[in-house]
Every structure is written in C-alpha cells, then in structure tokens.
Amino acid sequence: MNCYKTHTCEELRKNDVEKEVTLSGWLYRKRDHGNLIFVDLRDFYGITQLVFNNDKDFFDEISNLKLESVITVTGIVEARTEDTVNSSISTGEIEVIVNNLRVESEVEFHFDEEIAKEERSILVSITGEQEYPENMRFKYRFLDLRREKVRNNIILRSQIIAELRKLMIERGFLEIQTPILTASSPEGARDYLVPSRLNPGKFYALPQAPQIFKQLLMVSGFDKYFQIAPCFRDEDARADRSPGEFYQLDLEMSFVTQEDIFQIIESTLYRVFAKFSRKSVDKDFPRITYKEAMLKYGSDKPDLRNPLLISDVTEIFRDSGFNIFKSNIERGMVVRAIPAPKTAEEPRSFFDKKIEHAQKEFGAKGLGYITFDKDGTAKGPIAKFLDENRLNHIREATNIEPGDSVFFASDKENEAANIAGKVRTLLGSELSLIDDNIFRFCWIIDFPYFVYDDKSKKIDFFHNPFSMPHGGLKDLEDKNPLDILAYQYDLVCNGIELSSGAIRNNKLDIMYKAFAIAGYSRGEVDTRFGALVRAFRFGVPPHGGIAPGVDRIVMLLADEPNIREVICFPMNQQGEDVLMGAPSKVEDKHLRELSLKVIE
C-alpha cells in the first residue's frame, strides 16, 4: 500500500463514506472556524475538503501551517450536509475528518524581508485571485504552474502532442530524431552557435529546423518521416513567437504532390482542433494565392473570420480630381480601398482617429475616406474631388451599401497592401465583425521564388531556397526571376501562420541555377550544403513537407493571446530565462577550454 495516498484528491465520492483514506497534497485554502479548521487539499488531480477538530493534538500545527505546505493526512470520509455541498468541485459531496497529520514539507520564506515579501505575494496568485508581472511569474514558475489555468494549458499541450503523434503513426509515418548539434544554415534567422572544444575556432549551430536532415531521409529511402522537433532561432519575441526555442510537427513525404500534403495536414489538424476545442472548426481549407492574399487581405496571413475585403481602385483614381492620389499613381503607386460597414453616421472623430492611428502605428502616408449616407450621398474630404461616375465605380468595387464608408490607402504596392491589411484588421476588430467562436483555415500558395532586397540591392530567396520552382529549370533560365513562382505554401488559422512548407527541388541543376540567381557560386553551394549536394547525386525522389508549429496550435486551442502561456518554462521578451538565470556568464577556465575570450 502506498504510504502517501489511497486516493487522489479528485476521487472520493458519496459511496466512499465511512472509509478510512490517506491523501497527500498541497494546503490550498484554510478557513478557521475556532473549534474547526477546514482545509482544501489540492493535488494534481483535484481538491478535497479536510476537517480538523480542535480535540486533536495536531490542531495547533495545522492552524499555524503556511499555505502551499505539503501534508499527508489519514481520516474518515463523511457526507456533507445538504446545505454545505460544493457543486463546483467533483468531491463536493464529501469531506474527510482528519485523524492523523504528517507535514511532508513546510513553506519557508526567505530570510531577506524584501524577497520574502515577493514570495508571499506570488503565493496569492495560485488561488487565481491576482495577476503578477510576467517576470515575477517566470521567476517563480514552479509556483505559477500550480495555478489551475496555467497547469491546464500544459496538460492540454501534452494531450495535443500525444494526439498529433498518434495520428501521424496511424498514417504510416515513422518518428525519427535528427541531430541537435549541426552546421549553420541560411534559414533566414540568426543561429544559436555552440563552440567546439575539440575543434578550436569552429562552431556547431542549433537547428533552426531539421530541413536538410529530413530531405536526406527521403534520399535515404524513407517514405514518411515525422518528429515533434525542437527548433532554435535567435529571434525577437512576439505574441505568437517565443524567443529561443519552439516545437513543430515536422514531416516529410516522398513521391507526393502539394495536394497530397494538404490532405494529410487538413485531416490531421481538423481532428485535433475539433477534439480539443469547443469552438466550431470550418472544414473548408481554401487555397489563396499569395498575390490574391496581398490584394484582398493585405497580408499573407489573412484572418478569414474578418469579412472585409480590400479592393484595388487605382484605375478609378487615375486622372481624377483628387491630386494626391492622382500624383501617386503617376509615380507608379497604387490605391487600395477598405470598406467600413455601417459607419457613415459616425462622427468625424471616428475617422480622424483611425487615420491618426494608421499614420502613427502603421507608418501610413496617403490616407483618406469617403462616407456614403443612407440616401447614397457621398461625403468626406475626398468625395468632392470625384464625379458621380467614379463614386459609382467605388461602390461597385468595394461592394458597399448606403450607410457604409470606405477608407483608402495609397503608396507603393507592397506598402499599400501592408497598410490596407492592418486597417482591415483594425476595422474588423473595432466594428466587432470577427467571430471569436470559430477556427477558419486557409492555404497561401504560389509564393514568389525570389525577391529583390532593397538593402543589399540584389535578388534573394523569398522563402525556402530548397523548394521547386514552377516550370523547373526552364523558368529559371527564361523568366524574369521576380516573376517565378514556387511550390511553397503556408497554412494560416485565424490570422496566425501555423506552418510553412514546400515541394522540394530534387535536381542538382535546378539547385545550382536557383542559387546562382541569388548570387551564390557553385563552389559556395557545395561548401554550404555539401551533404545535400552529395546526396543529390545518388537518386532523389520527388518529395515535400511541412512543419505546423506546435506552440501556436496549443496557443489557439487554449484560447491564449500569448504563446508564452502554453510553454512550460518560457523565456521573457528579452530572451532571458529568469528562473534559471540564463543567459549567464561562464568561468574563464571554461572559455579557455573553448579557445574563447570575452571582449568587454
């Protein structure tokens, strides 16, 4: 028999009345009624009410014991009276009359009063009564994790990962681990570097993704690979991005098309989202080209819950009487229109605040608006410069109705798309147009293969350099590089990018040509990607893959606004682990072993 417990704190029911039981857990709440003390004992599974009578010799001990101390009790189960039943907990019909108490571990506050004050205050948060600054929560994460909501997020994460793993195995995928210490790669973010003691002056890199390894597995003859892969990128924190490390459902398949991968991911994620959320899950995963996404939504991560669609109204304003937009168009710029339903009767301050916000927060320049009264009359600072024919074209292009308004953004094409997209998001939120009770997915496809980098003044890869271009080698040789599309795709849910993937290039001549366009010599390719180049000489199957982000999936299903809430031991926004004190300085002898020196 277990000396610590016969039952968990969630198990006991009315049919256990008169049984002698032993329970262990944390002293969660305590209520002193003079001759009786009621204690809520909490373990991982639930809560049970304990009753301590003042005729017991341990009454003073429990009276003075601090909350969150760990105890073991033995006692008799009794039914609560009808008026004291607690329906909010599963054990609410019973209580345990304690006959024996053993203190396993008592809370002891730090001798420094300032630190002790901090420790006492953070204990209060465990009952859910008060929130604390993120750094304090992370410093005492072992206490923060005792909170029901935080604990449930970590349990949910475990359950989701188990379900993903089960579904992958059901579909014939093999779980294979790839190296953590590897070579630096041009994934687009900064690497975390690890110095080699045995090879002075050389460094390993923590993998930004298992990209090359999973392609090598396909070359090796494995048909379907997956792993819950840890990835490491030295990036700044965001609400949907944790600094340092993250996890993804990394997978790769041989002899597949883009649609084959879509079908696997759609069926997998639909089952996971439907199982772990009470929200509706849209079964439709529409395919939207990158070009269409940037035009209609102003983003390659569109939130399809937002019904607003952006329109291109450049031609309507060409040669118009509104000189600001007319001049912009003559200089090669565009004009985008964003509808704002049922806002025509809003005061002018409503529109001025939106424009001011867009200017300050989005860097917007050419902005304006038109309101269309219920009788159809157009008003606003732009309306007087447009004839009725142009106004009708705006009504048709934006599909608005009387009583609606339209915001406009004019700039270079990419900038105008970005600004219009942010205005669309702002309006969708402030006008309460977004349904928070549904998950809507979409695929973004046909990304550009290359992009012109204004800073370096050269062509570079838009996304993954190992993807297959549309048209293969012929397009690389014959087309303007900026017109070439790639078999690359992103999966988006409610405006959050869950995953990127691609059909891979499996031919050396295409690889060399693509990298040549991006400014890499054949020798540089051989040096930087030697393993892949060697492998590609020995028969490479057509293959492709994808890697949905586990942290973001859990964040969405937990309905948390910040990804750090679903990570067990997260870093703060500065990339610091305040619990363990990382990053930290190391001793000089360790640096000497690694042939390193810190320059102040």
UniProtKB/Swiss-Prot annotation:
Enzyme class name: ligase
Annotated protein name in UniProt: Aspartate--tRNA(Asp/Asn) ligase
InterPro entries the UniProt entry points to: Aa-tRNA-synt_II, aa-tRNA-synth_II, aa-tRNA-synth_II/BPL/LPL, Asp-tRNA-ligase_1, Asp-tRNA-ligase_1_N, Asp/Asn-tRNA-synth_IIb, AspRS_core, GAD-like_sf
Cellular compartments per GO CC: cytoplasm
Keywords: Aminoacyl-tRNA synthetase, ATP-binding, Cytoplasm, Ligase, Nucleotide-binding, Protein biosynthesis
GO terms of biological process kind: aspartyl-tRNA aminoacylation
A GO MF label: aspartate-tRNA(Asn) ligase activity
PROSITE patterns named among the record's database cross-references: AA_TRNA_LIGASE_II (PS50862)
PANTHER family listed in its UniProt record: ASPARTATE--TRNA LIGASE, MITOCHONDRIAL, ASPARTYL/LYSYL-TRNA SYNTHETASE
Pfam families registered for this protein in UniProt: GAD, tRNA-synt_2, tRNA_anti-codon
Localization terms from the record: Cytoplasm
The protein's Enzyme Commission number: 6.1.1.23
Reactions the enzyme catalyzes: tRNA(Asx) + L-aspartate + ATP = L-aspartyl-tRNA(Asx) + AMP + diphosphate
CDD domains: AspRS_core, EcAspRS_like_N
Region spans: Aspartate: 211-214
Domain of life: Bacteria
Function: Aspartyl-tRNA synthetase with relaxed tRNA specificity since it is able to aspartylate not only its cognate tRNA(Asp) but also tRNA(Asn). Reaction proceeds in two steps: L-aspartate is first activated by ATP to form Asp-AMP and then transferred to the acceptor end of tRNA(Asp/Asn).
NAD listed as a keyword: no
Binding positions (ATP): R233, D234, E235, E497, G549, V550, D551, R552
Subunit structure: Homodimer.
Gene3D superfamilies: Bira Bifunctional Protein, Domain 2, GAD-like domain, Nucleic acid-binding proteins
Principal place of residence: cytoplasm
UniProt-annotated site: Important for tRNA non-discrimination, residues: H33
Binding-site residues for L-aspartate, renumbered to this chain: E187, R233, H463, R504
Family assignment from sequence similarity: Belongs to the class-II aminoacyl-tRNA synthetase family. Type 1 subfamily.
